[in-house]
């Protein structure tokens, strides 16, 4: 399993995984979630991929098919009178394909995100 930044070619798989997540939410909370929808559209995903401060990391199999993702966002704590400025990497969403669970893909994605945060000088990783 390889982990890399998401690319435009990953959008169909990202949408499929986002749909899996939304389906779970819709089953648990049908009063607020609409089945068959996703958090982002194709266009929104394409725009997200261009934003350096919102990296999307994907775990891909030997055929380069996305089996899981971590949507992240770089946040900077601005200077205030009681805190020094620092950067953190926020994990907005993490998903592993339901057919690939139990293979430590989520754990690998989380470890990769932590390493990326460290390399980018982040103070912390938050969920």
Language model: regions and residue ranges:
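Hydrophobic adenine-recognition pocket in adenosine-nucleotide-binding enzymes
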Residues: 6, 94-96
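Conserved GNAT-fold acetyl-CoA-binding loop/helix
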Residues: 23-45
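A short helix-loop-beta-strand connector motif used in the catalytic cores of GNAT acetyltransferases and
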Residues: 43-58
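Conserved beta-strand in the GNAT
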Residues: 58, 65-74, 95
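Conserved acyl-donor/pantetheine-binding loop and adjacent beta-alpha core of acyl/acetyltransferases
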Residues: 71, 76-89
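Conserved acetyl-CoA-binding loop-helix of GNAT-fold acetyltransferases
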Residues: 96, 102-115
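Conserved GNAT acetyl-CoA-binding A-motif
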Residues: 117-127
């Amino acid at each position: 399993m390889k982990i890399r930044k998401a690319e435009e070619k990953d959008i169909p798989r990202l949408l499929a995984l986002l749909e899996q997540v939304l389906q779970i939410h819709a089953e648990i909370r049908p009063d607020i979630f609409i089945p068959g929808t996703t958090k982002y559209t194709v266009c929104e995903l394409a725009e997200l991929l261009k934003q350096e401060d919102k990296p999307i990391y994907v775990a891909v199999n030997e055929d380069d098919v996305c089996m899981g993702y971590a949507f992240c966002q770089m946040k900077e704590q601005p200077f205030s009178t009681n805190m020094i400025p620092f950067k953190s990497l926020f994990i907005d969403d993490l998903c592993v394909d339901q057919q690939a669970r139990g293979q430590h893909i989520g754990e690998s994605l989380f470890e990769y995100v932590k390493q990326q945060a460290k390399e980018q000088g982040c103070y912390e990783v938050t969920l």
